[in-house]
Amino acid sequence: MIEATYSDRKSAVQILSKSFDSNKSVEYVIKGGPKRRTQIRALMEYAFDMCMLFGEVYISDDKKACALILLPYKKKLTLKSIELDIKILFFCSGIKKLSKVLKREEAIRDFHPENKYAHLWFLGVLPQEQRKGYGSKLLAELTASYSKRHLPVYLETSTRSNLPWYARHGFTLVKELRLGYSLFILKKDLTLYHAFARN
């Protein structure tokens, strides 16, 4: 995998926008309507920019998969982050959905740890390249990297059929949130080796 730079923004946003085109969790956040795909693209641009500020972005070597990771312990209020928040509010979610989105984020945070961790915000593969192992390879590389850095990995998915796939990669279910749809919070703890190495 390759750690992305801003020059990879267009490719990353394209991969994620196509991958999450019909995702329930994304639909919950955006305004919807005839401009829904523009809104999805705006959401992915926002997530990319936030992870470049307060996390990491990785693209597979073949440029077919992308992952956005937020490191919450690095997150802070800056003029840039405020600008991004305002932009996403007007171009993606809208005022009417603000309350729902904030309540969802608060509910998710209730099941995230107080200690340092990595939040796998988005992991996507180009639709025509799915089920070929590209996502599995990237996820395995990511979790191995964060395990070496002593960071458990948390993520959310609204795709029930993906739960067995995540389980094969060592993730366990933390909580199922009911938000008009099911949102599953998953985690992958440190391996025993890396847990002992940290102590």
Model regions and ranges:
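A short beta-loop-alpha structural element at the N-terminal edge
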Residues: 1-15, 22
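Conserved GNAT acetyl-CoA-binding A-motif
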Residues: 115-119, 146-158
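Conserved acyl-donor/pantetheine-binding loop and adjacent beta-alpha core of acyl/acetyltransferases
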Residues: 66-123, 130
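Active-site rim helix/loop that mediates acceptor-substrate recognition in acyltransferases
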Residues: 34-54
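Conserved beta-hairpin
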Residues: 52-70, 126
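Conserved beta-strand-loop-alpha-helix junction that forms the acyl-donor binding cleft
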Residues: 121-130, 154-164, 179
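Conserved active-site alpha-helix within GNAT-family acetyltransferase domains
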Residues: 136, 148-150, 159-176, 180
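Conserved acetyl-CoA-binding loop-helix of GNAT-fold acetyltransferases
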Residues: 131-144
